[in-house]
């Protein structure tokens, strides 16, 4: 569960390292974002000499959360960290690589390009 002011890692090579959520996109009354939801975030830490700079406002899709997620088959999955992948206006990833495992729920949210870049889909 990601809400405003939540810090998360970045799971791609766009240059950002840490994000802080400032808005959960969707309807006005959404408080939390889960896996596959799009957020608006600010870059808190960035790698020098990369396109994404510190204090830049970016859109990102949630790839991993520490909050457990129940699946329809009864299994539960949870990750060690909160992580997001930065995206552009067309919902394509800004980076060319994705790091770490990605939840299968992104496939249902039409983020197939992120799924194809991921080394492992759980």
UniProtKB/Swiss-Prot annotation:
Pfam families xrefs: Ribosomal_L14
Cellular location(s): Plastid
Domain of life, source organism: Eukaryota
Gene Ontology CC annotation, any one: plastid
Keyword RNA-binding: yes
This protein's record includes keyword Chloroplast: no
InterPro entries named in the record: Ribosomal_uL14, Ribosomal_uL14_bac-type, Ribosomal_uL14_sf
One of the GO BP terms on file: translation
Record keywords: Plastid, Ribonucleoprotein, Ribosomal protein, RNA-binding, rRNA-binding
Subunit structure: Part of the 50S ribosomal subunit.
Family per similarity comment: Belongs to the universal ribosomal protein uL14 family.
Protein name stated in the entry: Large ribosomal subunit protein uL14c
Protein species of origin: Aneura mirabilis (Parasitic liverwort)
């Amino acid at each position: 569960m990601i809400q405003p002011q939540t810090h998360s890692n970045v799971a791609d090579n766009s240059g950002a390292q840490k994000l802080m959520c400032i808005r959960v996109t969707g309807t006005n009354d959404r408080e939390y974002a889960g896996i596959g939801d799009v957020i608006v975030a600010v870059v808190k830490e960035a790698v020098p000499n990369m396109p994404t700079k510190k204090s830049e406002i970016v859109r990102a899709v949630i790839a991993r959360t520490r909050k457990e997620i129940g699946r329809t088959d009864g299994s539960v999955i949870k990750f060690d960290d909160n992580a997001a992948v930065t995206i552009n206006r067309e919902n394509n990833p800004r980076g060319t690589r994705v790091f770490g495992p990605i939840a299968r729920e992104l496939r249902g949210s039409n983020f197939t390009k992120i799924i194809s870049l991921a080394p492992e889909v759980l």
